[in-house]
Amino acid sequence: MPQKTEDNNAIFDDDFIKLDLYDEEENKVWYDLEQNGQMIDIAVVPIKEEIEKYILDIEDAEEPFNENVNLNIADEIFVIGFPFGRIGGILPIWKKASVASEPSLDLNDMPYYFADTATKSGMSGSPVVLYEKRPVVIAESLQGKFSKYRTKFVGVYSGRIGANSDNKNDAQLGRVWKVDMVDKIIDQFEK
């Protein structure tokens, strides 16, 4: 969930974007979802104002002709975020991971799968992408233009299992919420 600051804002960076997390009556402004009596650990914050700085719509970042992704066990994926807050400056760190459980099945009746990765604090809420080295068409209007890499948004990372444990030999498994949960949360609130 977004972190509340003293002035009820979420701050992405001192120089970037400041979003209110609560309205004047102290009601949360983000969207979340409960399933099977448990919270899905994804928050969607609606952005109602035009923002011109550093924003790239995830759909614009994907190759439009490669939408069908079959995510499999052992596929290499990346968790893109800011470990410990701001390491890396304005650009995120790409932490390599691999799919560690069957991604087409829910775990504990919840829509997530495990990733094998050694992530650290600050990565929760990060997008998870499949990033494969293979040529793909960039856009129909750019016929004959190819990218060397295929990138596809495949989930939202929400932390390691056993992260609060003193055991330094924990399994280093992270929970990745399935990408369709983002659409489900938005659809529920935008009806």
Describe the residue ranges of each PLM region.
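Serine endopeptidase catalytic core focused on the charge-relay Asp
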Residues: M1-M110, D116-T117, S121, G125, ...
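Low-complexity, polar-biased intrinsically disordered regions enriched in Pro/Ser/Thr/Gly
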Residues: N9, D32-Q35, K133-S147, G162-K168
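Short beta->alpha transition motifs characteristic of CBS
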Residues: G81, F153-A163
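Alpha-helix termini
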Residues: W94, P135-A139, K191
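Catalytic nucleophile loop of clan PA
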Residues: T117-V156
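C-terminal tail/extension regions appended to the core domain(s) of diverse proteins
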Residues: G159-K191
